[in-house]
C-alpha cells in the first residue's frame, strides 16, 4: 500500500514490514502503524477486537472521545478515527481496512509526558496528517 504523509515526518520501517512509524522530530510525536494481512474471515474480527480493547484502555483515562468515519467504496477503504481528549499517551487511534485482505491499526503517540492543553495545537496539526493518510491510501503494493 501507499499513502501521502507530511514532508516534515520521517518514515521508519521495521525489518518485517508489519510496522511503520512516521516520526515528527520537531514535536516529538509519532504516527505508528501496524499492518496485518487478513488470511481468514476471523482475522478481521480479531483485529477489530484488539483495536477496541486498546481504544478502551486509552478512553478510560480520557475526558471524552470523538469518532470520525471515513469510507471510500471505490478504493475499498473503511476507517474510523478516534480523537481521545485529556491526559492520554495516544490521543488519536484509528484503523483502516478493506474488510477482506488488509487491516492497519494506527495511533498518534506522544514520546513525552505533557499537559494536554499545551500540546493540543500540535495534536490538531498531526490529526490533519492522519486524515490525509487515510484519504490518500491505496492498497496496491509498495
Residue ranges of model-derived segments:
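Surface-exposed amphipathic alpha-helical segments
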Residues: 9, 108-142
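Short connector loops/turns at beta-strand edges and beta->alpha or beta->beta junctions
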Residues: 25-29, 100-102, 109-113
